Regions:
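Binding-site signature for planar aromatic cofactors or substrates
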Residues: 1-132
Length: 132
């Protein structure tokens, strides 16, 4: 599902996380992100307060959008997020945030997103199709 092309776009682009609860959508850009070797999307929690509230209310449902601004190649990943507050993923994000913000911000945890569907958002004939 997370092909090499999808992973390349994810690794080289900013992500927007979309969640919804009680009919109120929310979207937030994230910079502290990664793709695990098993294809899960990892997001460091620095400013995800509304996102976390929505995930708690909606059973963890989330969508991630990323695209290459030069080529317009893009994907939307839909899946389920789990929130963790310790372990190697959280430790890595804590170190990265500490380094960037010199203590002015901290990573409180991480989202581990299990993809269920990957949808092409690139303009053209494949737009809207699902990556298998």
């Amino acid at each position: 599902m997370i092909t090499e092309e999808v992973k390349s776009v994810l690794m080289n682009s900013m992500w927007d996380l979309a969640t919804c609860a009680n009919g109120e959508p929310n979207v937030v850009p994230v910079a502290f992100k990664d793709v695990s070797e098993d294809g899960k999307l990892l997001v460091g929690d620095v400013f995800l307060n509304v996102t976390l509230k929505n995930l708690n209310a909606n059973g963890g449902r989330i969508a991630v959008s990323a695209y290459d601004a030069q080529t317009l190649t893009g994907y939307q990943v839909k899946g389920v997020a789990e929130y963790v507050t310790d372990g190697p993923v959280v430790a890595a994000f804590k170190a990265a945030v500490e380094k960037m913000f010199n203590g002015a911000a901290i990573a409180k945890g991480a989202l581990i997103i299990t993809p269920e569907r990957v949808i092409v958002t690139t303009p053209g004939a494949q737009n809207g199709s699902e990556v298998k």
